[in-house]
Swiss-Prot record:
Protein name: Large ribosomal subunit protein uL10
Function, in words: Forms part of the ribosomal stalk, playing a central role in the interaction of the ribosome with GTP-bound translation factors.
Gene, per the UniProt record: rplJ
GO molecular function, one term: large ribosomal subunit rRNA binding
Single GO cellular component term: large ribosomal subunit
Gene3D superfamilies reported for this sequence: 3.30.70.1730, 6.10.250.2350
Superkingdom of the source species: Bacteria
InterPro entries noted in UniProt: Ribosomal_uL10, Ribosomal_uL10-like_sf, Ribosomal_uL10_bac, Ribosomal_uL10_bac_type, Ribosomal_uL10_CS_bac
Similarity annotation: Belongs to the universal ribosomal protein uL10 family.
Subunit relationships: Part of the ribosomal stalk of the 50S ribosomal subunit. The N-terminus interacts with L11 and the large rRNA to form the base of the stalk. The C-terminus forms an elongated spine to which L12 dimers bind in a sequential fashion forming a multimeric L10(L12)X complex.
UniProt-listed PANTHER family: 39S RIBOSOMAL PROTEIN L10, MITOCHONDRIAL
Keywords noted in UniProt: Ribonucleoprotein, Ribosomal protein, RNA-binding, rRNA-binding
One biological process term in Gene Ontology: translation
Organism: Borreliella burgdorferi (strain ATCC 35210 / DSM 4680 / CIP 102532 / B31)
Amino acid sequence: MSAKINAKKLEMFDLLKQFIDSKQNLFFLDYRGLNVAQLTELRNKIEGEHGSLKVVKNNIMKMVLKEKNINVVDSCLVGPTVVVTALEEANVIAKIFYDFVKSSTLKVKGGFVLGEFYDEAKVQAYSKLPTKKESISLFASVLKAPVSKLARTLKALADVKN
């Protein structure tokens, strides 16, 4: 029986290792109090933005992180834990689960963004940053404003001369 358990744990270890392989953005959430439907809804929203969500066993996750030389605060791996990974824009994924936090018992424990540990407060601040699309749009409007102002000024001068 012990060999069966160890084989199962080894399989879980390998699956978790593959799950976080080459992912630079990881978030740890406490899903205590969520029902299956809520967890499925959260998973679907996250996967819709190129992220992944996986319920993990804390001890096995600790071993995987240790093997990958990732130091995580112990409080991130206590109690029921889901790990969320982001393939692209991590702050979009963070916005999704923070929107979910407002209407459920979901709690953010912390995470890693580009290899740097973020506590709950930092993850929340990170979730409020503009997305890549929003940043590009803002930058374009900043570039456009002086040109528009110049055009209005030249038009006003032309109107005055006529």
